[in-house]
Design a protein with these regions (language model features):
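Membrane-embedded alpha-helical bundles that constitute the cytochrome b-like, heme-associated redox core
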Residues: 1-194
Length: 194
């Protein structure tokens, strides 16, 4: 079954590469022991700032794709089956879900919100002449804690994905087996137009 189009797969890859670059450079800028190893702080700052801004580009460019827009709608809607999935998951019982389960929907919402907050606070920190010191101080606080939250979310995302080779294959090739789809996304497998 087709799970993702070529455009959707490239949006994911582009966003992952740019956010990964942003997070790695952030670690080298923030952690003293890594800062000492890297040196060239000015270069790291420049790469960090531009990769952070560029991380928005794949998603914005992806809005041209009808399939991507349809998946954004799916990610933005919680239905009765989603509430059932959450209750069943807390009790460690199986429950059908659509193309995206509620865990994926919550991750997408939190990650998107965190990226927007990180971009806004980063811009305040970057263009210091545009904001008073109190705003820059608050932006730094929010940016640092937001980075920690986003890092934890991304590591959790990678951890869960590492335990599902067929899901990773679906993101690499665009296709998953019908058996996998029925096991993990039954409502979508039975009605791909969900």
């Amino acid at each position: 079954m087709r799970r993702f189009t070529v455009a959707e797969r490239w949006i994911h890859r582009g966003t992952a590469a740019l956010l990964g670059t942003t997070m790695i450079t952030a670690a080298f800028l923030y952690l003293p022991m890594l800062s000492e190893i890297a040196g060239r702080r000015d270069l790291l700052v420049t790469v960090h700032e531009w990769s952070g801004l560029a991380a928005l580009v794949p998603v914005l460019a992806g809005l041209v794709s009808r399939a991507f827009r349809a998946d954004l709608v799916r990610l933005n809607r919680f239905g009765p089956h989603d509430r059932g999935w959450l209750r069943a998951t807390l009790r460690r019982r199986p429950h059908p879900s659509g193309k995206f389960n509620p865990g994926q929907k919550m991750y997408a919402s939190l990650a998107a919100g965190a990226v927007l907050v990180m971009t806004g606070t980063g811009l305040i920190m970057w263009f210091t002449s545009l904001a008073p010191l109190v705003y820059r101080t608050g932006a730094t606080f929010v940016h640092d804690w937001g980075a920690l939250l986003l890092g934890a979310l991304v590591l959790g995302h990678i951890w869960i994905a590492s335990n599902d080779p067929e899901a990773r294959g679906g993101l690499r090739t665009g296709f998953v087996s019908r058996a996998w789809a029925r096991r993990h996304h039954e409502l979508w497998a039975d009605s791909p137009e969900e």
